[in-house]
Amino acid sequence: MDDELEALVIGEKQLDRKLVADILSPYVRLDRNTRNISPMEAWLGLGTDLKILVYLVARKAMMLLRFGLEAERATANEIADDTNLKLDAVNRLLRNMYAEGLLERSKGRRYFVRDDALDRVWEKIGQQKV
């Protein structure tokens, strides 16, 4: 009975690390020393919305791997700066993805991908051809 209940729990402990790796592996590499997210060639083929999602999932992975980031969450300015995307587009897409339930927003308007939304992120990225 306890195992069945534990299967309902969402959190870092239950996070599907393979799914996180599957989402990220075609698009980015993570540098532990510099704490940078390095895009690969396939990154260029992603739409702006998917770049934001991959970036935020990469931050989630860096927290799981204990890279020493202060937080998984990122502001629109941080996302725009780190990804070279236009701030207006980032703000608009963050609001849309928050409304869709893909993202959560904390104090200070810092966004992160919900653990329970990773499957939907995978589906959205899967609809894009690599």
Predicted regions and their residues:
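A short alpha-helical element within helix-turn-helix/winged-helix DNA-binding domains
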Residues: A71-D81
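Minor-groove-contacting beta-hairpin "wing" of winged helix-turn-helix DNA-binding domains
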Residues: R73, R109-D115
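A short, conserved structural fragment
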Residues: Y98-G108
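Short, amphipathic alpha-helical interaction segments positioned at domain boundaries
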Residues: L118-V130
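Short amphipathic alpha-helical interaction segments
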Residues: D81-A99
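Short, well-structured alpha-helical interface segments that form or flank functional binding sites
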Residues: G47-K51, A74, D88-R92
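Short helix->loop/beta-hairpin flanking segments within DNA-binding domains
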Residues: D49-E72
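Long, low-complexity, charged/polar intrinsically disordered regions in eukaryotic proteins
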Residues: M1-L44
